[in-house]
Amino acid sequence: MKLLHLDASILGTGSVSRELSALIVRRLAGDAPDAVTYRDLVAENPPHLTVATLPGAHPVSAMAGPLDAAGQAVRDASDRMLSEFVAADTVVIGVPMYNFTIPSQLKAWIDRLLVPGTTFRYGAAGPEGLMGGKRVILALARGGFYGPGTASVPAEHAEHYLRTVFGFMGIVPELVLAEGLAAGEHNKAQALASARDAVGQLAA
């Protein structure tokens, strides 16, 4: 099994999403850590989307014209991000919710994945995802409560976006959720215990 592990939290050891993503990887990888590719998207800080930063497989990338050495290095990094995702059997992503949505570093990584003819295609019936055999697990941490039945549902643009974008590629992501982390120590402790239990219930 090839496992791709990504983190997008700006926090270090205090990050709940980083803790949960690491727990998931340990459960899945077991005694085969060499099968894991790890990317810290905050440390790598992929640049935002332009025609020059698109992977070479994207048809729009040709509009960038000839690239200098620095531009080619960015293009090569984009190609690597796409190829790592395509090659992975399982992808584990630590996702904090910032300002109602995902971190911009994670969005920049996702922008490298949506390549027509590689991860999806357009057919007579509309778009078709090409990554349906891939497993994606999201370790999502939220300070407030945004689940069904709460008043904040319309403000939730992290989980909803990720389900939409991976669904577009043919993937139904699994979710390990810790929410209400900023609603007092009691709520935080309950959320962490529930999320850790959910990790233990994941199919290895």
Curated annotation (Swiss-Prot):
Known catalytic reactions: 2 a quinone + NADH + H(+) = 2 a 1,4-benzosemiquinone + NAD(+); N,N-dimethyl-1,4-phenylenediamine + anthranilate + 2 NAD(+) = 2-(4-dimethylaminophenyl)diazenylbenzoate + 2 NADH + 2 H(+)
Cofactor note: Binds 1 FMN per subunit.
Obligatory cofactor(s): FMN
Gene3D superfamilies membership: 3.40.50.360
EC number(s) reported in the record: 1.6.5.-, 1.7.1.17
Gene Ontology terms, MF aspect: electron transfer activity; FMN binding; oxidoreductase activity, acting on NAD(P)H as acceptor; oxidoreductase activity, acting on NAD(P)H, quinone or similar compound as acceptor
Keyword tags: Flavoprotein, FMN, NAD, Oxidoreductase
Record's keyword annotation contains Transmembrane helix: no
Chain sites annotated for binding FMN: S9, S15, V16, S17, M97, Y98, N99, F100
Family as reported in the entry's similarity comment: Belongs to the azoreductase type 1 family.
PANTHER family found in the cross-reference section: FMN-DEPENDENT NADH-AZOREDUCTASE 1 (PTHR43741), FMN-DEPENDENT NADH:QUINONE OXIDOREDUCTASE (PTHR43741:SF4)
Function: Quinone reductase that provides resistance to thiol-specific stress caused by electrophilic quinones. Also exhibits azoreductase activity. Catalyzes the reductive cleavage of the azo bond in aromatic azo compounds to the corresponding amines.
Assembly and binders: Homodimer.
Designated name of the protein: FMN-dependent NADH:quinone oxidoreductase
The encoding gene: azoR
